[in-house]
C-alpha cells in the first residue's frame, strides 16, 4: 500500500460520527457530512456527474460535479463535497552511524473543495464558507485523533505510520466557478525502517 492510499483510507475509516461532530466539534446540523475522499492518481476511483464509476482511458480525465445532489458513494460519502489527497514529496534520513535504519517523512496535501451559489443548498456565499470551515474542522479532528500513528489495512495489505501531523493551510478559491477550497498540509512519519 502506498502512502496516498493510506491517507485516503485513514480519512474514510476514521471520519467522526454525527454525534461527535455535534457534541465535540459544534458543527451545525447542515454541515455534519462525510465528503468524498479521492486519491488524485486513481482516475477510476472518481465518479462522473451521474454518479457512475468505471475505467478511464489514458489521457482522459474523470469529471466530478460538486453540484451532484446524489452522492457518488465513493467511500460511503454522504455529500458531494470533495477532499482530494496527493503526495507532495518524501524525505529519508539515516540516523545511525552504520546507516542500518531509515526514517521516512511524507509531505501530503488534502485539498478540500466545496461549492457555493448556483446550487440548491443555499442562497448566499455564507453557506459555502461555513461548509468549508466545517469540513476543515472535521478533517483536523480526524488527523489529530490519529497523530500518534495508526495502522491501515486494506485486504491483506497494511501500512503503519508512527506520527501524523497537521500542518498549515492555504485558501484555494475560484471565484469565477464559485468554488471554495483549502489546501491542508499533512506530514506522515515512519521511524527505524530496516535497510
In which residue ranges do the predicted regions lie?
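Small/polar-rich, solvent-exposed N-terminal microdomains that initiate assembly or binding
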Residues: 1-99, 146-155
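Oligomerization/assembly interface segments of phage tail-like spikes and tubes
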Residues: 100-119, 177-191
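Polar/charged side chains located within well-ordered beta-strands of beta-rich proteins
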Residues: 81, 87, 104, 157, ...
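Acidic-leaning, charged glycine-interspersed low-complexity segments
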Residues: 130-193
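Short, solvent-exposed mixed-charge patches
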Residues: 1, 194-195
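Hydrophobic beta-strand residues in large extracellular and virion-surface proteins
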Residues: 7-11, 83-85, 108-112, 139, ...
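Extracellular/virion structural assembly segments
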Residues: 99-105, 113-147
Amino acid at each position: 500500500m502506498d502512502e496516498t492510499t493510506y491517507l485516503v483510507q485513514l480519512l474514510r475509516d476514521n471520519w467522526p460520527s454525527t454525534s461527535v461532530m455535534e457534541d465535540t466539534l459544534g458543527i451545525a446540523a447542515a454541515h455534519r457530512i462525510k465528503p468524498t475522499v479521492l486519491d488524485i492518481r486513481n482516475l477510476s476511483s472518481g465518479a462522473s456527474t451521474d454518479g457512475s464509476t468505471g475505467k478511464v482511458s489514458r489521457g482522459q480525465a474523470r469529471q466530478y460535479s460538486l453540484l451532484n445532489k446524489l452522492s457518488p458513494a465513493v467511500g460511503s460519502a454522504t455529500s458531494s463535497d470533495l477532499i482530494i489527497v496527493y503526495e507532495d514529496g518524501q524525505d529519508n534520513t539515516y540516523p545511525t552511524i552504520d546507516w542500518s535504519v531509515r526514517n521516512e517523512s511524507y509531505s501530503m496535501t488534502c485539498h478540500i473543495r466545496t461549492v457555493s451559489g448556483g446550487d440548491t443548498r443555499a442562497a448566499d456565499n455564507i453557506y459555502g464558507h461555513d461548509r468549508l470551515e466545517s469540513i476543515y474542522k472535521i478533517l483536523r479532528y480526524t488527523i489529530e485523533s490519529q497523530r500518534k500513528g495508526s495502522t491501515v489495512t486494506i485486504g491483506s495489505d497494511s501500512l503503519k505510520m508512527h506520527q501524523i501531523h497537521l500542518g498549515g493551510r492555504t485558501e484555494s478559491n475560484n471565484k469565477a466557478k464559485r468554488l471554495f477550497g483549502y489546501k491542508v498540509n499533512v506530514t506522515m512519519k515512519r521511524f527505524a525502517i530496516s535497510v
